[in-house]
Amino acid sequence: MNQDIFIVDGARTPFLKSRNRPGPFSASDLATAVGKTLLARQPFAPSELDEVILGCASPSVDEANIGRVAALRMGCGYKVPGWTVMRNCASGMQSIDSAIANMRSGRGNLILAGGGDALSRAPLLYSDQMVMWFSQFAAAKTTGQKAALFLKLSPAQLLTPVIGIMRGLTDPISGLLMGQTAENLAHRFGISRAQMDSFSARSHARVIRAQDCGIFHGANEGLSPDSLSADRLSSEIEPLFDAKGTLYKDDDGVRKDSTAANLAKLRPFFDRKYGNVTAGNSSQITDGGAWVLLATEEAIKRHGLKPLARIVDSQWAGLDPAQMGLVPVHAVTPILKRHGLGLNDLDAWEINEAFAAQVLACIEAWKSVDYCKSELGLDSSMGALDEEKLNVDGGAIALGHPVGASGTRIVLNLLHVLKRTGGKRGIASICIGGGLGGAMLIENVS
């Protein structure tokens, strides 16, 4: 059943940068808060959803099957199934793709799909050696045995935890940190430190411009209770309030002083001797959540919904994990071929900015005759992507990359860009730890 699937609404939280301590919201808090606001403005009850699907890479230990947790907390009721997907950085795009598959197989007409992560709450873990010590201590039967174990205990063992997020950002096959895979691409395509820093400064500048123009908030810029109904649909971000009543209204990782010159002062992080990838030209560790509401034509007619975009096609691809950041090229290209499109036949692009080097490598790969022939099976290069159409409101280098949410965010932002500019078609694409990539072609119908 190849029926059309439409995005009829969507929203996200502000993306909140990790400040080296647990943030104010868990992943389910983020998903629930923005989901409640999104559902409250719909002409149907949350219990009329057919399904809720949430992507999450790092739920808390008390958020098992976080998709179900969020569905219940959003008021969807016991009868609406809620479940969780995990495809690392593309978890939020996988949730959309999974929803589409279910809708096209006749298993739903109205599905809420999204993603969320609170990376600031990634755990600190005991080492295997320390866990073994606890096991031995629990098995010790006499005071003497326990005392002997205490004498063997090194303060360094106790006070040097395993940093969970560093383990999560390390590929288990290649043994490389994600930033080291970006260094591989920079070396392969001859991408300089200056190019990376210039790209990163542009990301910050574009987010600042979008914030100054109220683009992310639309009619919600003043947080007025009068800015409701149709006007409110122009808002991408919905504000958050924590338990103390503190308002979180904007993405807070962007820096107005992020110029190429300032970024050039930062030291390489992943290859300290020879590298060029720094904290400044990499995505930030961030907390955030996002949803899109998907509907078939039947659901649109039944509830009087307004379709905003049609999801035309999607594609997943894989490469050597050590070349992780290049896979968007391999996910996007088959979509373009299937629809007879060139790079610049699209009106807008989103390529998630895991690393500046990684996005720039994708652009260089399409330009390379050798790469297009040997790796993509093409007769010539794809040409130069118009960077004025790419990440026009900035990207993860300035906004942050809450892993489970980013795939949904780039689809949502792409929709808003097409609406705002009157563009017809756009692609959202994302690289994925483990040597994967995903892409989604959407068409503006509003």
Where are these regions (language model features)?
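Condensing-enzyme catalytic core mediating Claisen C-C bond formation in acyl metabolism
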Residues: M1-S26, T37, L153-G168, A260-L326, ...
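N-terminal extracellular/periplasmic Venus flytrap/periplasmic-binding protein-like
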Residues: R12-T13, P24-S28, A33, R41, ...
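Conserved beta-ketoacyl condensing-enzyme motif
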Residues: P24-T143, E221-L223, S227-A230, S235-D250, ...
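Short, well-ordered amphipathic alpha-helical segments that serve as non-catalytic structural scaffolds
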Residues: A27-P43, I66-A70, S95-S98, M178-L185, ...
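Conserved catalytic cysteine-centered active-site region
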Residues: C56-I111, R121, Q157-L159, I173-L177, ...
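Active-site-proximal alpha-helical scaffold in enzymes
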Residues: M86-D117, L125, A186-I215, S227-A230, ...
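Flexible glycine-/small-residue-enriched beta->alpha junction loops
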Residues: L110-N184
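Active-site pocket-lining segment
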Residues: E183, L233, A243, V312-Q315, ...
